[in-house]
Regions:
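Zinc-dependent deaminase catalytic domain
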Residues: 1-158
Length: 158
């Protein structure tokens, strides 16, 4: 199994911790500092943080939770981390909260976002997250192999 599938599987396990609701997706996220990245002196990847939808109080998303939990600790160097998320990060929030794409960009720590499945247009039509990330110089990669599992986890309770 590739490293990408291993980390996406871990993000999927996070998604399964979500309390299902018909009005939101169940998403999981894992933040990784890859081996060889600035700030990683170990001979292996380091998992820095994890998160899942509604893990923290309020209407929180998986990426938001993982980033907020990370900020409580020491931040990795700029443009060094990778975030794996079972569904592409939101580019817009119906609640008015800061979209996850904006949080990822503003943090300055991410060089790559790896997604398990594209966001269905159930709540937001035409998610512009990918375009925003790429415009900010952050790589956007679709990890093939767990799409069905990611979508099933996301839509649990719908």
């Amino acid at each position: 199994m590739s490293q990408d599938l291993i980390y996406m599987s871990l993000a999927l396990e996070e998604a399964k911790k979500c309390v299902a609701t018909p009005t939101a997706f169940c998403v999981g996220a894992v933040i990784v500092l890859p081996r060889g990245a600035e700030g990683n002196r170990k001979d292996k990847d380091i998992i820095l943080s994890t998160g899942y939808s509604r893990e923290l109080p309020g209407n929180t998303h998986a990426e938001q939770c993982a980033i907020e939990k990370l900020i409580d600790d020491e931040l990795p160097p700029l443009n060094s981390a990778v975030i794996y998320t079972t569904m592409e990060p939101c580019g817009e929030r119906l609640s008015g909260n800061v979209p996850c794409v904006d949080r990822i960009i503003r943090s300055g720590i991410f060089r790559t976002v790896k997604v398990g499945v594209i966001e269905p247009d159930t709540f937001i039509k035409d998610n512009a997250g990918k375009q925003k990330l790429e415009a900010a110089g952050i790589r956007y990669v679709h990890v093939n192999g767990l799409e069905r599992e990611c979508l099933e986890a996301a839509t649990r309770g719908h």
